[in-house]
Regions:
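Membrane-interface interhelical linkers
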Residues: 1-13, 41-69, 82, 110, ...
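Glycine-/small-residue-enriched transmembrane alpha-helix faces in small-molecule transporters
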Residues: 1-34, 72, 76, 80, ...
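Helix-helix packing/entry segments at the starts of transmembrane helices
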Residues: 5, 93-99, 164-185, 218-254
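Hydrophobic/small/kink-forming positions within alpha-helical transmembrane segments
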Residues: 16, 20, 45, 71, ...
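Hydrophobic/aromatic residues within transmembrane alpha-helices
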Residues: 25, 32, 84, 96, ...
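Specific alpha-helical transmembrane segments that line the substrate/conduction pathway
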Residues: 31, 38-42, 82-113, 154, ...
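Hydrophobic transmembrane alpha-helices of multi-pass small-molecule transport proteins
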Residues: 44, 48, 116-136, 154-155, ...
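Loop-to-transmembrane alpha-helix entry segments
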Residues: 61, 65, 97, 113-133, ...
Length: 288
């Protein structure tokens, strides 16, 4: 459990820096996602081949279906989120995106028969209060309903992604991440192809950030993420998942110079405090 927990946290920190790296690329959000998923899936395919692992997903059609739905949802969520970055800012969009775990938490007793404990519910209330504090001073969302809707839709797609990936029982780890990311690439490719017939023009200065976003943040990040969430409780994934938007907010302040008000700082404390409390209580209760 500890190894998977560490991998999950590292993945969240990488994902938290996505908005910062993407802000350096002078392309439309959907094209950034297309290039990101292409580079990331290509890396995972190469690693899978070099590791000489056997292909197993063809034996489990139900798992293939669940991973495909999860991958399509991930591609859609990223395209929606990246557009929201532009309209309402990286920090605010990231926090709204992470309403997704709340949806997952509420559905977990029905979909996965996981017990919804009082501590988990209490921790979520603390986390949600933190989000309210952070959004209370966000000037970017005022008068920009479109950006808010995009971020909200990305949260719904996030929930779909986690739920269907959790349903994959046999296909795990690198193979799972490889398929998931490749389907995300296909989703972005179909969208971009239907939207425009133009060849993507990339400035020479953008290549470094595209490769970082695709190979490190996406390829490595997705491997760490999808190789760990299958072994973690859904409610743990949901609660600790708020470390990603927290890191995104902090990076947006220090790197992009987005405004951090006292209410934002208080909100960040609530978010981190709620996540840490839930995990400390779980470890004490289980003795792990």
């Amino acid at each position: 459990m500890a190894k998977n927990y560490i991998k999950y946290i590292l993945a969240l920190l990488l994902f938290g820096s996505n908005g910062i790296v993407a802000s350096k690329i002078a392309l439309e959000s959907s094209k950034i996602v297309l290039l990101r998923t292409f580079a990331g899936s290509l890396l995972l395919i190469v690693v899978f081949i070099l590791s000489k692992r056997k292909i197993s997903f063809l034996q489990f059609k139900k798992d293939c279906f669940n991973i495909a739905i999860s991958g399509a949802a991930m591609g859609a969520s990223w395209m929606l989120l990246y557009e929201a970055y532009i309209q309402i800012g990286v920090g605010t969009a990231s926090l709204m995106y992470y309403c997704g775990p709340v949806i997952v938490m509420l559905l977990s007793p029905i979909l996965f028969r996981e017990k919804l404990t009082g501590i988990k519910i209490g921790s979520f209330f603390v986390v949600l209060v933190g989000i309210l504090f952070i959004n209370s001073g966000a000037e970017e969302i005022r008068g920009n309903a479109g950006g808010v809707v995009l971020a909200g839709m990305s949260a719904v797609m996030y929930a779909v992604m986690v739920i269907f990936n959790k349903k994959s029982v046999h296909v795990k780890g690198l193979e799972n991440a490889m398929i998931q990311l490749f389907v995300s690439f296909l989703t972005a490719a179909v969208y971009v192809g239907c939207k425009t017939n133009e060849v993507i023009q990339i400035n020479s200065g953008d290549w470094v950030y595209i490769l970082i976003l695709g190979l490190v943040n996406t390829g490595l990040g997705c491997y760490l993420y999808f190789s760990s969430i299958g072994a973690l409780p859904v409610q743990t994934i949901a609660v600790c998942g708020y470390l990603e938007p927290l890191s995104a907010v902090l990076l947006s302040v220090f790197v992009l110079k987005e405004t951090l008000l006292p209410m934002h700082i208080l909100g960040a404390v609530f978010i981190l405090g709620g996540a840490v409390f839930a995990e400390i209580f779980r470890h004490r209760k289980t003795g792990t």
